[in-house]
Amino acid sequence: PMHLDDLDAHVMVGYATTLGAKPYPFEYLDTTAGSGVYAWRMLKANVTVNNAESYSNACLAGLGIIQVPRVSAREQLLDGSFIEVLPALMARPMPISLLYPNRRHLPKRVQVFMDWLSELMQTYR
């Protein structure tokens, strides 16, 4: 697909968190008319999965298009297993949360890890 409307001729791999739920739609930043709001488009899905590994594997098997954060597909994009389509239609950024015990003095190694991860994720913004 080269344009948003081209997606209608393709199928996606559906992703749903629970059995029987509707799959998530394709999400993109709608810049038509300068709106700059996120919009959704439901694509036909022949298969729906409920975990990230199955989602990627279904795409690799040719069962449809998937929408994942670049960091999740980095290796497949680099080795050519995945081909990025419609890169201008970015989905909303996904937050990453780090949970740690509430302590007055945070261990240095925890702080170093948090700083490293934060810097690493800046690459994917």
What are these regions (language model features)?
Residues 1-93, 123-125:
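C-terminal regulatory
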Residues 85-125:
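A late-sequence structural motif
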